[in-house]
UniProtKB/Swiss-Prot annotation:
Disruption phenotype: No visible phenotype under normal growth conditions, but the triple mutant cka1, cka2 and cka3 show altered circadian rhythms and delayed flowering under long day conditions.
Function: Casein kinases are operationally defined by their preferential utilization of acidic proteins such as caseins as substrates. The alpha chain contains the catalytic site. The tetrameric holoenzyme CK2 is composed of two alpha and two beta subunits. Acts as a circadian clock component that maintains the correct period length through phosphorylation of CCA1.
Protein kinase domain sequence ranges: 34-319
KW RNA-binding (keyword) present: no
Keyword Ribosomal protein included in the entry's annotation: no
Organism: Arabidopsis thaliana
Keywords: ATP-binding, Cytoplasm, Kinase, Nucleotide-binding, Nucleus, Serine/threonine-protein kinase, Transferase
EC top class, as a word: transferase
UniProt-annotated location(s): Nucleus; Nucleus, Nucleolus; Cytoplasm
Coiled-coil regions listed: none
Protein name in UniProt: Casein kinase II subunit alpha-3
Assigned GO CC terms: cytoplasm; nucleolus; nucleus
Length: 333
């Protein structure tokens, strides 16, 4: 059995009310307090609008949920409530529903974010260090509260570049971590799925988020979005194996006594690891440093137990400048 290296027993020692989301009694607010301004996006499970609170004129984001199991909605609400006020976690303001259709909506703080496909190519080396560090604060916090996000990707990281403000959003796939529990492997978005999901290891943990973060980081420093571009879940593992090598994959499978299905094994083939230096080119070399490569290498490990935790990641030398700037800013406040 595999268990998390950190924050293993958070939900074991907390009262049942903390993690037992099925028992949540939702306190509904008033839908009339909000009006929709414009549509800003849609996901598999929701449509998202910019809105405003008609009483205060304050901008907000309204996430109108598509018909989905009540249990899943309660899970998202409970997690958002548990994490509210944590560093760089999107704030849930209210939960409302339509009187007639009973369609629930979640009301969040507004973040004036730019599409990552537009923003990322403009980021400097320092910007990337800064924003990844801000994202790590959110991840370490949610992990410390016994929660895995399970859908870390650029689309779920809102950045207001003018205010240098980052928020981790969309907690719809997030789940409470219970040691030894077997989870659904059909989570995360394909390009950010950890090897554990692709080889059907079900007793995964917070370290799944660290793989997804590694994929996101690789995309940013190498300017290759997405970094692992699989056409389906099988091909996703092939794309990973072509970079990390197949001996290392075998080692991982053996350690956890897993077998690949023969069809997948044939697709994966045999590959030697590809050095990270092979991804450096004239376009991205200003973003790649020895410490960036070292940091990436410690995230993109097949074995989830070998990946840096969010806390360990924050202590990596890659963030030394960011931490120095942060402590001097705090001193001068």
């Amino acid at each position: 059995m595999s268990k998390a290296r950190v924050y293993t027993d958070v939900n074991v020692v907390r009262p049942k009310e903390y993690w037992d989301y099925e028992s949540l009694v939702v306190q509904w607010g008033h839908q009339d307090d909000y009006e929709v301004v414009r549509k800003v996006g849609r996901g598999k499970y929701s449509e998202v609008f910019e809105g405003k609170n008609v009483n205060t004129n304050e901008r907000c984001v309204i996430k109108i949920l598509k018909p989905v199991k009540k249990k899943k909605i309660k899970r998202e609400i409970k997690i958002l409530q548990n994490l509210c006020g944590g560093p760089n976690i999107v704030k849930l303001y209210d939960i409302v529903r339509d009187e007639h259709s009973k369609t629930p909506s979640l009301v969040f703080e507004f973040v004036n974010s730019v599409d990552f496909k537009v923003l990322y190519p403009t980021l400097t080396d320092y910007d990337i260090r800064y924003y990844i560090y801000e994202l790590l604060k959110a991840l370490d916090f949610c992990h410390s509260q016994g929660i895995m996000h399970r859908d870390v990707k650029p689309h779920n990281v809102m950045i207001d570049h003018q205010l240098r403000k980052l928020r981790l959003i969309d907690w719809g796939l997030a789940e409470f971590y219970h040691p030894g529990k077997e989870y659904n492997v059909r989570v995360a978005s394909r390009y950010f799925k950890g090897p554990e999901l692709l080889v059907d290891l079900q007793d995964y943990d917070y370290s799944l988020d660290m793989w997804s973060l590694g994929c996101m980081f690789a995309g940013m420093i190498f300017r290759k979005e997405p970094f692992f571009y699989g056409h389906d879940n099988h091909d996703q593992l092939v794309k990973i194996a072509k970079v990390l090598g197949t001996n290392e994959l075998d080692h991982y499978l053996n350690k956890y006594q897993l077998d690949l299905d023969p069809q997948l094994e044939a697709l994966v083939g045999r590959h030697v690891p590809k050095p990270w230096s092979k991804f450096i080119n004239a376009d991205n070399q200003h973003l790649v440093s020895p410490e960036a490569i070292d940091f990436l290498d410690k995230l993109l490990q097949y074995d989830h137990q070998d990946r840096l935790t969010a806390r360990e990641a924050m202590d990596h030398p890659y963030f030394a400048q960011v931490k120095a700037a942060e402590s001097s800013r705090l001193r001068t406040q």
